[in-house]
C-alpha cells in the first residue's frame, strides 16, 4: 500500500510528498543512515512536532535548537532548488551546513511537489523568521511556496486561483505574493 505506507490515512497524511521526501532522503544520506532500514514510523519521528496539521509525533528526531531564527528567503530558495535538482549529489559541507539545518527545520514537513517553507513575517519591518515553534510578537505565520522558476509562474498562478476562490465566495486564509531577491513567491497564512 504505497499511498498510506501501512499507516492509517489520517496519519499517513502527515508524511511529506516529493519535496519533503527529497529533504528527508538527503538528511538520511548526510546522517549516514541507510534508507533501506527506514520505516514510516522513522519518517514520522523526523516530522516530530513540525507536521502541517495538529498531530505531533514522539519521540521526535532532534534537529537541533528549536527557537526561531532569521530567514534569508533568497539564499534558502536557491539552496532549496539545489537540493531538489541535485538531491542525489548535494552534500552537507562547511559552506552550506547552516542553510541545510535551516532548510530541514522549516521546509521538510509541508507536503506537495514544490519546495515550500513555514515562515513568520513581520508586516511592519518585513523581517522573515522561521515559523516553527514559538514566534516573536508582531509576526504572522505563513506557508511560503517558492516559485519554482520554470516556464510557468506557479506562485502567480496560485495567487490567481486564490483570488478566484475569494471572488466565488469561498473562505480562504489570507494569501499574498511577496518578492525576495527578484523572485515572487506565494504566501498563505496558517
Pin down the residues of each PLM region.
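Phosphate/dinucleotide-binding and metal-coordinating scaffold of catalytic cores
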Residues: 1-190
Amino acid at each position: 500500500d504505497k499511498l498510506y505506507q501501512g499507516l492509517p490515512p489520517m496519519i499517513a497524511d502527515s508524511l511529506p510528498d516529493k519535496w519533503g521526501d527529497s529533504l528527508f532522503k538527503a538528511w538520511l544520506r548526510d546522517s549516514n543512515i541507510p534508507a533501506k532500514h527506514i520505516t514510516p514510523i522513522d519518517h514520522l519521528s523526523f516530522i516530530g512536532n513540525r507536521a502541517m496539521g495538529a498531530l505531533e509525533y514522539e519521540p521526535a528526531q532532534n534537529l537541533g535548537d528549536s527557537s526561531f531564527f532569521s530567514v534569508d528567503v533568497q539564499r534558502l530558495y536557491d539552496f532549496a532548488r539545489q537540493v531538489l535538482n541535485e538531491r542525489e549529489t548535494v552534500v552537507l559541507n562547511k559552506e552550506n551546513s547552516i542553510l541545510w539545518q535551516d532548510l530541514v527545520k522549516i521546509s521538510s514537513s509541508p507536503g506537495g511537489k514544490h519546495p515550500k517553507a513555514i515562515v513568520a513575517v513581520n508586516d511592519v519591518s518585513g523581517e522573515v523568521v522561521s515559523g516553527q515553534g514559538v514566534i516573536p510578537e508582531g509576526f504572522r505565520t505563513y506557508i511560503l511556496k517558492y516559485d519554482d522558476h520554470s516556464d510557468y509562474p506557479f506562485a502567480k498562478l496560485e495567487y490567481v486561483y486564490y483570488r478566484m476562490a475569494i471572488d466565488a465566495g469561498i473562505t480562504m486564509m489570507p494569501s499574498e505574493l511577496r518578492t525576495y531577491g527578484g523572485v515572487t513567491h506565494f504566501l498563505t497564512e496558517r
